[in-house]
Amino acid sequence: MNKLNINSSSKKYRTSFLVAFILFSCLISIPVFAEESLIILYTGSVLGEVKPCGCTEEEDLGGILRRATIIEKERSVNKNILLLDAGDTFKEPTEQGKLKAKTMIEGFNKMGYDAALLGEKDFVYGEEILNQGSFDHWVLSNVENNNLKQEKTIKYFLKIFNNGTTIAVIGLLGQELLFAKGQTKVKVENPGIRLEKILRKLKAAGEANIILLLTHMDKEKAKELFNLDDVDIVINGHLDETELIVNPEIAGKKIMVHVRERGQYLGKISISTDQKKIQNISNEYIPLNSKINDSQLVQSIYDKYNDETKQLFMKWLQDKKRAIKKTFITEIACKMCHRYEYAIWKKSGHSHSFKSLKKSNKTFDPECLKCHTTGFKQDGGFMSESITPKLINVQCEACHGAGSNHMKFIMRDHKAEQKKINILYKKLTEDSCLP
């Protein structure tokens, strides 16, 4: 009996082992299908902000050095990255603005942007700066400009990800914006009509799984394109000055987003796909704050921009030194009669505003000096710390205007003339504080 029991137990163990082995083998051979994660990083309406002002915490956002750091970080954890810009990279035409424009174009190339749309402000320096720049992925689907080199522009861009999913990027500029700027040399086709032609071509060729529109137009016009059945994603780069923050709109598995002003945030759209189709889609804005380290990837072009800005300032300084006029009387003179107001000013950030420029090594930057000194680029106003040391900081005359004539009337003993004192100063409003 014992012998039979032993054999029976042995068979039982062998059977259990065989069943376990078969089940384990099946588990190993079952393929696991994980959803592919696709990331779209985007900017737009940067308006030449190479580096943030940083005077206050709320303004210390943005800049190409921090942006490049986040882009590098995203690429280190996900190879499925699409990097785009939706236009208005430049601002108003100035000498320093042109240096910024060149830096921005080089930044697109260094950071590896896949495509960028031109906004209406990006034509302020003409086509020469675009033709000379190193970036050659300007996506202009509905724009014809014979002055732009053909190799610099593309009609649409196809991004093929590791899982085989293809996103078609189409760049559409609003006709009303360019016509308002008087860009008569540039021909802009109706965005809707042009889009229809491209979609027909893409459908016939079966080239794309996801349709993404980079738009630079009024919000409502972009919304009309977003509502089309074949459009999956819209990134709009034009911001209305009265509505700088526009929330994303999600409709099913479609999304429409708007950029954040001056490159202070990096937009990030996350997409999960199955069989090359969108399953889930979401958006977030990554704040480019002071916690983010500067990237070495674009440090060299930023340093070059800084050097050229300093040269620009020194050239202006040499020209200005030839004709110095004394029209500003400085805070010391104001204090004699306006002690109460002076005491309030002395406790304010205005009284030591120049320190922040020294801290960030920006005492030569014209765009910073106009807000941190008194009378910069005005007759008799601030020139440099060494030449006009008494005009550093935002003094009384920075807002009220030069006080030399005011002082002359005060020194005279004529009541009739003293009545004119108030006329000499401009009325101060909120606009007086804006650069």
Task: List the model feature ranges, each with a label.
Residues 21, 62-64, 148-151, 304-315:
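Short coil-to-helix leader/linker segments, especially the first N-terminal amphipathic alpha-helix
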